[in-house]
Design a protein with these regions (language model features):
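Catalytic glycan-binding domains that act on GlcNAc-containing polysaccharides
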Residues: 25-177
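N-terminal Sec-pathway targeting helices
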Residues: 1-13
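Polar low-complexity intrinsically disordered regions enriched in Ser/Thr and small residues
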Residues: 11, 15-16, 102
Length: 177
């Protein structure tokens, strides 16, 4: 009887091992490789939710008004809030600014005192948003006027332009689908 139990346990263990549910291999397309960033937040979170989380977190950290922080994201990469399910943050501008907040690599290196790669800055939402909010705070501390800050964020020199007015007047009026 004991040997029958041992055989039954061994057969049961073999069946469990054979029929265990494992995670299927994730099929990556070119667009998901750019957007799904494991070190940013859990792999299952859409980029729009990652953006929402990190903008709120770092705007609070650097004391940036939320509507301005979200206004920059909207002006730079057309971010439309947490329900913007097809949002692609891994964009590159014609001027070579990268990522969701369109930060230049040289600016990121200067602000963060590191040697960040263009690809990391472009694809890591957390790092890109952090860099953007840190830059906005530094510019505001120097200039004292949000419109001038937004103009400088956009052009690299202190000014008030159409972009500055767009961000300054941005309204949080997202619609849930």
């Amino acid at each position: 009887m004991i040997s029958n139990i041992k055989i039954g346990i061994a057969a049961g263990a073999l069946a469990v091992a054979a029929f265990s549910v494992t995670q299927p291999e994730e099929k990556l397309t070119e667009s998901t490789q750019e957007v799904r960033i494991p070190e940013s937040i859990d792999r299952g979170s859409p980029p729009s939710l990652q953006m929402y989380k990190y903008i709120k977190m770092y705007a609070d950290t650097f004391n940036i008004p939320l509507r301005y922080a979200f206004g920059i994201a909207n002006a730079e990469t057309s971010y439309k809030g947490p329900f913007h399910w097809n949002y692609n943050p891994a964009q590159t501008s014609c001027a070579n600014a990268v990522g969701p907040m369109q930060v230049m690599v040289s600016t990121a290196r200067w602000i963060n005192k590191d040697n960040v790669s263009k690809d990391f800055l472009r694809t890591n939402i957390k790092y890109n948003v952090y860099t953007s909010m840190k830059l906005l705070r530094k510019l505001y501390n120097k200039r004292g006027d949000w419109r001038v800050v937004f103009g400088e964020y956009n052009t690299g020199r202190p000014c008030i332009n159409g972009y500055a007015h767009k961000v300054y007047n941005y309204k949080l009026d997202w619609k849930k689908p």
